């Protein structure tokens, strides 16, 4: 309730979307136009795998066009302990480090860390024992800010209640997302929060006042999306071999250099442990 006794507005966000820059099947402009015309989302986050160039481009395009939904820059970081969403970041987070080091780097960059599709017995998912170790770590920088308590994939459906219970037991914010790799999937999972803006969403995650919602995929629909992803990967591999970078709305055609496999800022970073270039 607000001070005058009225109910505060509730916003809706989908904070896990992929574009053609990683393994999604739609470009930045397509996604923005779809969100504007076909959803009631107030916020979206572009979270390609281990890169932020398309997310930065999406934010700029949305602002320039005056689109309704605000864009948060993010990425889905590949850590050794599972995938984690980095939200509100302005630089890439180094991949393939421990989950605790990854989360600490996200926080050091001013971001929020949300383990994606956790507890599912799959190599890309943070397991309970790993998360419990982080929660017991005396360094608060290693603690996640919430959990992706709803992800519509049918693979994770059997573990959904367990994830919700884990978040509740450990005081972690609920975050629901679509993990969309196709336009039709955007908004199939969502997060509701008091307010409408990105700043209000961030405050809600930090104070644990978010809620998740969504509808699980049917297996047949997911198989269709996987088929499209495989065809897209084949085209990407062909273009890499041919030395071409396609101008397909990924963000690279908005002035961001680098091929699909070597995103910007990767080549110039040093390993923090050895000082050697990677």
Model-found features: residue ranges?
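Charged catalytic cores and adjacent phosphate/nucleic-acid-binding surfaces used
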Residues: 1-38, 53-59, 66, 78-93, ...
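Active-site flanking residues adjacent to catalytic metal/cofactor-binding acidic residues
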Residues: 15, 47, 75, 116, ...
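Loop/turn elements at helix/coil->beta-strand transitions in domains of secreted/extracellular proteins
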Residues: 40-41, 67, 109-112
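Short catalytic-loop micro-motif centered on adjacent basic/acidic residues
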Residues: 43-47, 148-149
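Acidic, metal/ion-coordinating pockets
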Residues: 50
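A short, structured active-site edge motif that brings together acidic residues
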Residues: 71-79
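Aromatic-lined carbohydrate-recognition surfaces of secreted/lumenal glycan-active proteins
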Residues: 114-124
């Amino acid at each position: 309730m607000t001070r005058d006794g009225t109910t505060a507005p509730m916003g809706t966000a989908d904070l896990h979307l992929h574009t053609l820059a990683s393994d999604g099947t739609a470009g930045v402009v397509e996604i923005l136009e779809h969100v504007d015309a076909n959803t009631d989302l107030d916020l979206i986050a572009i979270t390609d795998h281990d890169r932020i160039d398309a997310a930065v481009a999406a934010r700029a395009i949305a602002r320039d066009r005056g689109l309704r939904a605000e864009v948060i820059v993010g990425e889905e970081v590949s850590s050794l302990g599972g995938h984690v969403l980095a939200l509100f970041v302005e630089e890439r987070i180094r991949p393939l480090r421990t989950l605790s080091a990854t989360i600490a780097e996200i926080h050091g960059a001013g971001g929020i860390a949300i383990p994606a599709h956790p507890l599912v017995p799959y190599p890309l998912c943070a397991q309970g024992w790993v998360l419990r170790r982080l929660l017991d770590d005396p360094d608060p920088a290693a603690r996640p800010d919430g959990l992706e308590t709803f992800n519509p994939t049918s693979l994770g459906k059997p573990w959904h209640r367990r994830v919700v219970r884990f978040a509740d037991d450990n005081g972690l914010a609920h975050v629901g997302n679509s993990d969309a790799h196709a336009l039709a999937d955007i908004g199939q999972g969502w997060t509701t929060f008091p307010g409408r803006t990105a700043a209000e969403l961030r405050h809600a995650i930090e104070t644990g006042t978010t809620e998740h919602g969504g509808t699980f995929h049917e297996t047949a629909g997911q198989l269709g999306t996987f088929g499209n992803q495989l065809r897209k990967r084949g085209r990407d591999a062909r273009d890499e071999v041919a030395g071409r970078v396609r101008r397909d709305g990924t963000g690279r055609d908005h002035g961001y250099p680098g091929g699909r496999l070597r995103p910007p800022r990767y080549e110039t970073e040093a390993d923090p442990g050895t000082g050697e270039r990677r």
